[in-house]
Amino acid sequence: MHLASFMFKNALLNADKKTKNNFLSSLKKVIVSIIKEENLKVSIDDMEYFDNKALYQFTIPTKSKAQRATYTIFLQTLRIVALLHDVGHLPFSHQVEYALKKVYDKIKEKEQKIEDLCEKELRFKNNYEEITNNSKEVLHEAIGENLLKLLFDYELEELLVKSYEKEYLKLIKRLSILILDEQVFEGFDFKVLHNFIDSTVDADRLDYINRDMLASGYITGPNDHIRITKQAVLV
C-alpha cells in the first residue's frame, strides 16, 4: 500500500505537465460518470472528506481543487486495492492454487470424455467456476475481489455514520473493481493503474522481495525501493 502510493505520486510528479493534466482529466471524467450513473450525492468540486492530513506526504501540485480531489480519490483507491489485492491467497500461497487448478483441469478432462462425475467432483467444479468466472480469472484474485466487495458492503458500511461518507464509499468500491478487473471505462484503461500493483516492476514485488529474503534467512542489503519508486514516470 505504502509503496503503491509512492509509485503513483512519483509517476505523476515525474511526468510532463501535459501528460499529467490529460491523465487527471481522464480520471475526473471517470469519477463524474460514475457519480452520474449511480446517482451519488457527492460533487467532484467539493470533497472535503478526502482532505486528509495523513496523506500530505503523497500530495502533488495541482492546478485546481477538482484536480486535487481526483488525484486523492484515486490515490486512496489504489492504496485499498494494493492492501487487499493478495488477501485471497490460500495457505501455502500459489502452490495450493496451482494444485486446485490441476484438480479442476482433470475434472474438465474427465467431463470432456463424457465420463460421469461423482458428487464431490461436480461440487468442486461448480464452486471453482463460480468463484473464477468459469476459470477466466486467477483463483486468489477472484477470491480477493469477492472479499473486497464484502468488506465494502458490510464491514466498512457499518463503520461509517454520515450519509455522504457512504456515498464516497460506493464511489471507491466501483473504482477498485474497475482497477482489479482492468476494465476500460469512459475511454480510460484501468490496466494502467493496476500496473502499479501487478506488472513487471510493481509495488507488490518490491515489497515481497525484501520480506522473502528476510524470512528465508538471507541477510544482505535490501533493495532500495524508495530510490526505485522515485524513478516511476507516467508517459
Language model regions located:
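Sequence-structural signature of the catalytic-core scaffold of metal-dependent phosphohydrolases
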Residues: H2-I80, G88-V235
